[in-house]
């Protein structure tokens, strides 16, 4: 009697890895923060379109600082800045709404009233000047209030849920329309949320937004140092080799920092200053071009492989890889639980992060300040996200093809040899007649 064993496909391996990390990915607060920031991408891209237009170079001469916004009608240019100010200038407001909405949905709440009260609470905490009470108070409505937005959103929604879950609300008879019933249900928790934050900000005079800004102004630069970048990206690559979604894992912790850095760069450019923050989610396109591990050269090698199985994997992975999606390679080669491919996968990520960071430190490329769809081919993507800096496209070619191409080649040959030897054993065994 024989027992058939079925090999798991790359999709099954991905599902297994995701199952291991499910408790982290599905933790309501972390998942809501992640989903809230991801939902901001359309707003960031729309605001970035203004920068793309106004920062379009009008001269290709070396050292020229002439941009389209400088030579067009200045009244029109001023009006074009309005969409930028309405997106990046109110970024923390939108994050408050987005995170609170995501958390309210995860907590099983009708999100309309919880989100409204959370928005009001954030405005009390982050923009007291708008109330007319303190005309000198700082406002934290742009990227400077991102972490305040997270804190206010999470606490406010949990307070709302506390009252609803324990039925500490005003309930209406069964025949009352749902919209009216929900309005009365929201009354008590909404009162507690609004006046709770009012007490903290105005009676106790505790400036949460200002305090968080001071603290995080120390933390964010540390989290953006080379050491932090190298550690985070190496961990990200290692997790992928274990079948765990590395991008989601580190993104849960670092997405707010990436977004804050990108928004700070965009604001700097809008104010006529040079962008300085290096570690953004857009910077990571230098680190993981073609997908984590920069596997696009490996896909090309697979296509020319002597092993039929690797050729199939190569053709499956080459087209998604051009658009920075490489799960067919990661789980089809496989890289997962395969030291022959896992070691270069991690090494390439580390080297790419090092080379890209060093290029920024030496001022060889412009830091990213424009949000763009990450599925664009990496050289084009980096050219756009740096405000048409051709050097960024060159660096992207180096980190996508040159460095990975050199490192993947010996690993590919070693793995191809193992696959061919295995196929030589399996083919005769399959062709052998069964014994009577």
Go through the PLM ranges and name each one:
Residues 45-73, 204-226, 245-258, 362-371:
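Interfacial/capping segments of alpha-helical transmembrane domains
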Residues 191-308, 314:
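Generic multipass alpha-helical transmembrane bundles of integral membrane proteins
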Residues 25, 93-103, 120, 271-339, ...:
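Alpha-helical membrane segments and immediately flanking helix-loop junctions
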Residues 46, 92, 96, 100, ...:
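Alpha-helical transmembrane segments in multi-pass membrane proteins
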Residues 111, 127-227, 239:
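Membrane-interface helix-loop-helix junctions at boundaries between adjacent transmembrane segments
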Residues 2-24, 266-274, 299, 316, ...:
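Transmembrane alpha-helical segments and their short flanking loops
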Residues 22, 26-166, 336:
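Early transmembrane hairpin of solute transport permeases
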């Amino acid at each position: 009697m024989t027992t058939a064993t079925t090999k798991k496909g790359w999709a099954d391996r991905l599902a297994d890895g995701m199952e291991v990390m499910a408790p982290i990915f599905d933790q309501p607060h972390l998942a809501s923060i992640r989903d809230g920031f991801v939902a901001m991408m359309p707003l960031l891209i729309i605001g970035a379109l203004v920068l793309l237009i106004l920062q379009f170079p009008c001269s290709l001469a070396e050292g020229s600082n002439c941009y389209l916004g400088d030579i067009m009608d200045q009244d029109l240019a001023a009006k074009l800045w309005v969409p930028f100010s309405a997106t990046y200038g109110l970024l923390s407001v939108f994050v408050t709404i987005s995170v609170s909405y995501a958390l309210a949905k995860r907590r099983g709440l009708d999100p309309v009233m919880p989100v409204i009260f959370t928005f009001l609470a954030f405005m009390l905490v982050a923009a007291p000047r708008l109330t007319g009470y303190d005309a000198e108070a700082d406002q934290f409505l742009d990227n400077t209030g991102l972490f305040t937005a997270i804190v206010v959103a999470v606490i406010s929604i949990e307070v709302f849920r506390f009252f609803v879950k324990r039925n500490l609300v005003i309930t209406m008879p069964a025949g009352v329309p749902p919209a009216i019933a929900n309005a009365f249900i929201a009354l008590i928790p909404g009162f507690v949320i609004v006046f709770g934050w009012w007490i903290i900000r105005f009676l106790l005079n505790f400036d949460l937004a200002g305090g968080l800004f001071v603290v995080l102004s120390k933390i964010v630069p540390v989290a953006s140092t080379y050491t932090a970048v190298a550690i985070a990206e190496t961990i990200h690559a290692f997790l992928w080799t274990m079948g765990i979604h590395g991008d989601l894992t580190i993104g849960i912790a670092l997405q707010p920092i990436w977004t804050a850095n990108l928004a700070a760069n965009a604001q700097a450019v809008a104010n006529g200053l040079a962008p300085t923050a290096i570690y953004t989610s857009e910077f990571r396109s230098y680190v993981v071009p073609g997908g984590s591990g920069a596997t696009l050269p490996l896909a090309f090698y697979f296509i020319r492989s002597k092993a039929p199985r690797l050729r199939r994997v190569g053709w499956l992975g080459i087209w998604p890889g051009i658009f920075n999606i490489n799960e067919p390679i990661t789980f089809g080669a496989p890289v997962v639980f395969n030291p022959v491919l896992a070691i270069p996968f991690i090494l390439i990520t580390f080297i790419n992060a090092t080379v890209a960071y060093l290029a920024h430190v030496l001022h060889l490329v412009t830091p990213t300040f424009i949000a763009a769809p990450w599925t664009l081919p990496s050289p084009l993507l980096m050219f756009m996200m740096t405000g048409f800096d051709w050097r960024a496209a060159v660096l992207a070619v180096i980190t996508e093809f040159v460095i990975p191409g050199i490192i993947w080649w010996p690993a590919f040959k070693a793995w191809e040899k193992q696959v061919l030897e295995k196929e030589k054993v399996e083919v005769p065994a399959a062709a052998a007649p069964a014994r009577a």
